[in-house]
Every structure is written in structure tokens, then in C-alpha cells.
Amino acid sequence: GKVVSVEVRDDFAQRARRNVVRAGLSPYWDLRVGDVKGIELGMAVDAVALDMPDPWQALDNVDRFLRPGGHFAGFVPNANQVEGLVCGLRDRGYLEVVALENIQRSMEVHPGGVRPSYENLAHTGYLVFARRPSRD
């Protein structure tokens, strides 16, 4: 198998290429520079992972290359984006649509006790998972 990456920015694509080469994974990786909203992959893929501000706008094109029964994952940083993505997936008939919040917060650890830090410096992000139906 191979991982196909689509990066809209050439500078990010070059950074990704350096990281993949450094990790020794080049034989298993294919880089495309372009916009996932309209790029032609020329192949069907088993899974898609998107990290972009408006992933719901890419779903029409994702449907062209994500095989039936394939898995979808998306990362978005705010709740309004979760709504757009989840609604977009449901509108297309995707199954098992799940949205999860990932919260990172510091813990106070002392002998005899562990509790969350009272400082409210937390970072959150949302992961959305779904499966394309086996038949459209």
C-alpha cells in the first residue's frame, strides 16, 4: 500500500517531502501538490484524512476517489467546522459518523493525589470519523 498526500502549499509539500525522506518512507508515499477539492488522483483509495479549514467543501471530490466502504477522518479546530463536516457527510449518506473532542489539559501530580490543573489553558480540537456506504 501507499499513502497519497495532497498539499495545497508548495512550501509545506517540500517540508513534508523532507520529513518522509528522513523517515525512510519514500517508497510508500506519493505527494501531489494541489487542492484536494478538485485534484484528480487517478485511483481509488481506502481511506481519506483531511486537515483543512473547510473539509465539507472537498467532499464532492472525495466521493470520486474514496472507494465504497472506505473510511474518512477529518480534523477541525472549532465546533462550527464540526457542524459543517458532519452535516456534509450525513447529507452524502456516510455511515457511522462520529465527532469527538480532543482536550489537552495539564494535570497536577503529587504523592497521594492527582487532579486537573486549575489553570484553564487548554487546547481543543475535533476529530470526525465516518465510513462511505458500500453502495451509493
Regions from the language model: what does each represent?
Residues 1-4, 72:
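Short beta-strand element of Class I
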Residues 10, 79, 134:
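Short, glycine/serine-rich, charged loops/turns that create anion-binding
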Residues 56-126:
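C-terminal substrate-binding/active-site "lid" region of AdoMet-derived donor-dependent transferases
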